[in-house]
Amino acid sequence: MVVRGDRGRAVARAQGGLEWTDLLPALDPVNFPMLWALSPYGDAVFNERQVPLLLEELDRLPEAYGGAWVDQARDLCQVVQSGTHRYLWFVGD
C-alpha cells in the first residue's frame, strides 16, 4: 500500500502489505464495494472521495479479515485526507 501524489511520487508507504486470502473475494460486493474491488493481480486506486467509504468498510470489517494491514490502511487513508491530489494505491503483483 502506498499513497502517491498526482505525479505518481510516493508520499507515504505501509510497512507491510495486505496478505491475500480466500476470505477477501468472499466479501459481499454490496456491503463492501471498495474492499471487494481489491485484486491480488492488479492495482486498486482510491481517491479522496472514495477514502471515507473505504474507512467505513474497514470499521465494519469482520475480525477474521483483520490484521496489521487494516491499521496501516487507516493511517494511509489519513495521509490521503490530509492533502490534495493524493491517492491510496493497493498494489497487486
PLM region spans:
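Acidic (Asp/Glu-rich) sequence patches and key acidic residues
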Residues: 1-93
